[in-house]
């Protein structure tokens, strides 16, 4: 038999039956739990899809499935059986679940995916099954039992109300009135519930009291029915003394009862208004997340809570309370509070303490208790009056009962006494009302004055922070006085009026408010959270660090208060945009200054190239047969300084020249450090100090030097390139100086250096040209130049005396730059100082350490740099002895030259160092450019405020 024929031969059996043919199925609480909780949870699980339908053996190509599995089962079959009441008890349904899981384990291997999914479902099934009610009860049985009990009680009550027994009841009622007030729970309630409008009503209510005392086993419903069915025989069997009693009750009770009713309605309406407001607050949308379980009565059938009414005898919910409030069934606020607290107590009684509903009930009860505590209490005098009226009512009821047994004379005397007492009570009540009106007007005036003061001067409270404790103490005293004067009624009313009068916000205003709040700094957000928590009771206990605010749930008064505070904060920050404009203008000035420097450097470079072509001569170089000189450690800075000395006359207006040169000359620093931050005065300054040490060089970069070194880096690179090009050409005799620019004085030692520098600086020419043609390194910091200065000056230890130093100082006085550039540089330096100073110190110390190690390893290089440095600072106008000394030193240096191979190795090393340094600078520049895109506005605003304070 072929494979297709086998596949066609696989036929699925019919699904299991789900309709009980015997009709013996029942609906129990456990089966309801299995259907609504267990099956629903399993069906929603992500692993339940293979078990939701019967196994399709033909589709899955499982020919032996139904031969191995004799009783197939799936979730859909169980669901249909539960819906059609197939099961007689819950154990049958649990057996079907276990059959489904055992079929999976029987047919599949232990490691298969379907087995893992079945194990996960079985675990969930066992967890849900552990929550099932232990006792199985039929769901419809209780209702039938209740109906049977009610029918039996109705029949028994009807049998008791026969004409023969009704007469006995009438005689009993005639004997009881003397002791009746002791039987009633409160004469006030009886007086209110039973107005003496007709004879039958009074008699019926008296029968209620008698019935409750005589028969405690029967429920109140049956007694009420019996009393309602009994009036006709009662009317027939009235005795002769009954009308006398009713007349006395009529003549005495109406006045006192009416007076008490008027008083009670005034007080009740005042308090019940607040109670209705509390009920509206509890039913509001903002309390929905934790108040929704209490909106409606507990649905016992839907939730499967079949023992609920056994534990909770008096169920209560907010819907029932609202219905009673609408029907005006509450007489005072205490009854309303009792029902609300009963609702919460039922929740705490039935549910475990760690249940979610208990937490929600506690949150809602906090809201209720907080609002209920704000309800104004009744005054003490009025309470006493109420007690007096109740006592008088009790006395009246007792006296009326005694008068019913006595004659007409005693009843008339008691009536006169009652009238006198009632008159006194009315006088007392009038006096109390007058006192209350006077007391209520005084705090209202104080509150109006406070509101006017707060509206007139709201800013003084923010400025005078030290006065807050005094004001708080005064406010506390005023509050205590107000409490003693009983002003509690008016304050919550005023708050409610403010909340009602607050104009609600539309969508655009809420959106603008949220945007304005996002603009505020972090220190202002704490005040916003405080405002919201003080005005919103639902958010009072929330964490201020992780609070979530929904504008839709906030009150209109809270939103308006937030709007006022945000506008006040934004007015204070109105000067910030002006400061930002100033910063932008400075940045533009700085960029323009850089562009101008680059343009001038290009002009200087072109001029140097022209002069070099003019000064070319066919003279032979006398030093050509000698081996090339090894480049000493500081050749780049010396060449740069020399070229800049010759070019500084044409660029005398570069930024910050005067201030930097003067500061460097006064501090006695080296000439190379002054050259890096000077223009035209540095070519003739005698800036050689008696002793040069590497430690002193650590103090060289001052405030102005640091700034000007950064600004003059393009000048260094272009000048180095220009000097290299000039030195590669043929030179004349060593004593002859090259042709100079007009107005420029070049010292003799520089001329000698240029004559011998053609061989020394030849390897660096190509590198410097690449630097010139590449992008100008504008962001080069002061550290690199300081390191070169240290390398140049550290080895020098001999004293050099200069003749005519005063004349050279006068000749080298700095030319003052324009005030605009100077002021902008100083302002820029204040911004860059804090960021650069730490970096400069750390790198300088590291370079000093490296230089000392290098000088210790190569003593020859340090001696050569020392000699060259000593001979390089003698001016042209100095004596012939100094010139001769410099020429002698040059000749001695030429005699002590190393071999060409050593020179090439050293030059390669310096090239590698220079390239590494340039690479690090480029990486630093790119990192700063990347970081420049992210701007911390809070930090920028703080920097601007600090800058403005220092600038003023």
Swiss-Prot record:
Subcellular location per the Swiss-Prot or TrEMBL entry: Nucleus
Domain of life: Eukaryota
Cross-referenced InterPro entries: BRD4_CDT, Bromo_Brdt_I, Bromo_Brdt_II, Bromo_chromatin_reader, Bromodomain, Bromodomain-like_sf, Bromodomain_CS, NET_dom
Any coiled-coil regions, as ranges: 417-442, 837-936
Ranges where the record places region Disordered: 141-168, 209-257, 392-420, 442-504, 607-746, 850-930
Low complexity compositional bias, start-end: 216-229, 646-681, 893-902
GO molecular function: histone binding; histone reader activity; lysine-acetylated histone binding
Compositionally biased tracts (Polar residues): 151-167, 718-729, 874-883
Biased composition (Pro residues): 625-638
Bromo domain segment(s): 26-132, 266-375
Compositional bias ranges of the Basic and acidic residues kind: 141-150, 850-867, 911-930
Site location (Histone H4K5ac binding): 108, 113
Modification type Phosphoserine: residues: 186
Database matches in SUPFAM superfamilies: Bromodomain
Subunit note: Interacts with the acetylated N-terminus of histone H1, H2, H3 and H4. Interacts with P-TEFb components CDK9 and CCNT1/cyclin-T1. Interacts with mRNA splicing machinery proteins SRSF2, DDX5, HNRNPK and TARDBP. Interacts with SMARCE1.
Function: Testis-specific chromatin protein that specifically binds histone H4 acetylated at 'Lys-5' and 'Lys-8' (H4K5ac and H4K8ac, respectively) and plays a key role in spermatogenesis. Required in late pachytene spermatocytes: plays a role in meiotic and post-meiotic cells by binding to acetylated histones at the promoter of specific meiotic and post-meiotic genes, facilitating their activation at the appropriate time. In the post-meiotic phase of spermatogenesis, binds to hyperacetylated histones and participates in their general removal from DNA.
Family: Belongs to the BET family.
Protein name, UniProt field: Bromodomain testis-specific protein
Organism the protein comes from: Rattus norvegicus (Rat)
């Amino acid at each position: 038999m072929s494979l297709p024929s086998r596949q066609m031969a696989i036929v699925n059996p019919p699904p299991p039956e789900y309709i009980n043919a015997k009709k013996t199925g029942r609906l129990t609480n456990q089966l309801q739990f299995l259907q609504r909780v267990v099956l629903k949870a399993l069906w929603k699980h992500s692993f339940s899809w293979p078990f939701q339908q019967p196994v399709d053996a033909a589709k899955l190509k499982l020919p032996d499935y139904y031969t191995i599995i004799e009783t197939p089962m799936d979730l859909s079959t169980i669901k249909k059986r539960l819906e059609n009441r197939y099961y007689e008890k819950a154990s049958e349904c649990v057996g079907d679940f276990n059959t489904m899981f055992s079929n999976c384990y029987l047919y599949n291997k232990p490691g298969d995916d379907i087995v893992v999914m079945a194990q996960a479902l079985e675990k969930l099934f066992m967890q849900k099954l552990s929550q099932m009610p232990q006792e199985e009860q039929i769901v419809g049985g209780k209702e039938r039992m209740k109906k049977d009990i009610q029918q039996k009680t109705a029949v028994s009550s009807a049998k008791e109300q026969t004409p023969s027994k009704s007469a006995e009841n009438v005689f009993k009622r005639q004997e009881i009135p003397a002791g009746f007030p002791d039987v009633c729970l409160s004469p006030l309630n009886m007086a209110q519930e039973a107005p003496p409008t007709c004879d039958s009503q009074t008699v019926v209510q008296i029968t209620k009291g008698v019935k409750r005392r005589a028969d405690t086993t029967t429920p109140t419903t049956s007694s009420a029915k019996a009393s309602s069915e009994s009036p006709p025989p009662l009317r027939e069997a009235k005795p002769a003394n009954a009308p006398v009693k009713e007349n006395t009750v009529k003549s005495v009770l109406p006045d006192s009862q009416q007076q008490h009713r008027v008083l009670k309605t005034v007080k009740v309406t005042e308090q019940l208004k607040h109670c209705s407001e509390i009920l509206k607050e509890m039913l509001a949308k903002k309390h929905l997340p934790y108040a929704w379980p209490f909106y409606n009565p507990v649905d016992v059938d839907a939730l499967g809570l079949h023992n609920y009414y056994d534990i909770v005898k008096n169920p209560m919910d907010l819907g029932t309370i609202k219905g009673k409030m609408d029907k005006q069934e509450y007489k005072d606020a205490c009854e309303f509070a009792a029902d609300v607290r009963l609702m919460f107590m039922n929740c705490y009684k039935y549910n475990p303490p760690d249940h979610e509903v208990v937490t929600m009930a506690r949150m809602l009860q906090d809201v209720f208790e907080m609002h209920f505590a704000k309800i104004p209490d009744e005054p003490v005098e009025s309470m006493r009056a109420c007690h007096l009226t109740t006592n008088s009512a009790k006395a009246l009821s007792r006296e009326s009962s005694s008068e019913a047994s006595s004659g007409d004379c005693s009843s008339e005397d008691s009536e006169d006494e009652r009238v006198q007492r009632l008159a006194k009570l009315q006088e007392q009540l009038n006096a109390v009302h007058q006192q209350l009106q006077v007391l209520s007007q005084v705090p209202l005036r104080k509150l109006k004055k406070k509101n006017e003061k707060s509206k007139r001067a709201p800013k003084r409270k923010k400025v005078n922070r030290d006065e807050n404790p005094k004001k708080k103490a005064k406010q506390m005293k005023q509050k205590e006085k107000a409490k003693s004067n009983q002003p509690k009624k008016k304050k919550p009313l005023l708050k409610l009026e403010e909340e009602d009068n607050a104009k609600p916000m539309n969508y655009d205003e809420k959106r603008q408010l949220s945007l304005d709040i996002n603009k505020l700094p972090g220190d202002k957000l704490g005040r916003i959270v405080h405002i919201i928590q003080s005005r919103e009771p639902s958010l009072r206990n929330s964490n201020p660090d992780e609070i979530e605010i929904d504008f839709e749930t906030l009150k209109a008064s809270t939103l308006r208060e937030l709007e006022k505070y945000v506008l006040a904060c934004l007015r204070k920050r109105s000067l910030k945009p002006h400061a930002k404009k100033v910063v932008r203008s400075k940045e533009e000035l700085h960029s323009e200054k850089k562009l101008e420097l680059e343009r001038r450097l290009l002009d200087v470079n072109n001029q140097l190239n022209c002069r070099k072509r003019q000064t070319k001569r066919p003279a032979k170089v006398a030093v050509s047969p000698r081996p090339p000189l090894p480049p000493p450690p500081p050749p780049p800075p010396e060449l740069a300084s020399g070229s800049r000395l010759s070019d500084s006359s044409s660029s005398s207006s570069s930024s910050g020249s005067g201030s930097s040169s003067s500061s460097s000359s006064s501090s006695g620093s080296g000439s190379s450090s002054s050259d890096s931050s000077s223009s035209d005065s540095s070519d003739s300054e005698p800036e050689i100090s008696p002793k040069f040490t590497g430690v002193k060089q650590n103090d060289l970069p001052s405030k102005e030097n640091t700034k000007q070194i950064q600004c003059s880096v393009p000048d260094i690179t272009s000048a180095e390139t220009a000097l290299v090009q000039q030195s590669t050409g043929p030179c004349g005799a060593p004593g002859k100086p090259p042709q100079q620019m007009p107005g420029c004085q070049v010292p003799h030692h520089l001329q000698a250096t240029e004559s011998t520098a053609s061989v020394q600086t030849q390897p660096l020419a190509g590198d410097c040209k690449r630097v010139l043609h590449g992008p100008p390194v504008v962001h080069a910091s002061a550290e690199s130049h300081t390191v070169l200065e240290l390398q140049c000056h550290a080895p020098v230890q001999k004293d050099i005396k200069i003749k005519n130093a005063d004349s050279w100082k006068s000749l080298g006085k700095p030319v003052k730059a324009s005030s605009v550039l100077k002021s902008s540089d100083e302002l820029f330096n204040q911004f860059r100082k804090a960021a650069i100073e730490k970096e400069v110190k750390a790198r300088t110390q590291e370079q000093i350490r490296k230089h000392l190690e290098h000088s210790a390893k190569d003593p020859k290089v340090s001696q050569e740099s020392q000699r060259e440095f000593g001979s390089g600072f003698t001016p042209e106008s100095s004596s012939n002895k100094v010139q001769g000394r410099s020429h002698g030193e040059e000749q001695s240096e030429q005699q002590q030259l190393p071999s060409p191979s050593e020179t090439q190795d050293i030059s390669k090393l310096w090239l590698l160092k220079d390239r590494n340094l340039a690479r690090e600078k480029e990486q630093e520049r790119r990192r700063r450019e990347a970081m420049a895109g992210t701007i911390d506005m809070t930090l920028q605003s703080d920097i601007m405020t600090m800058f403005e304070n220092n600038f003023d």
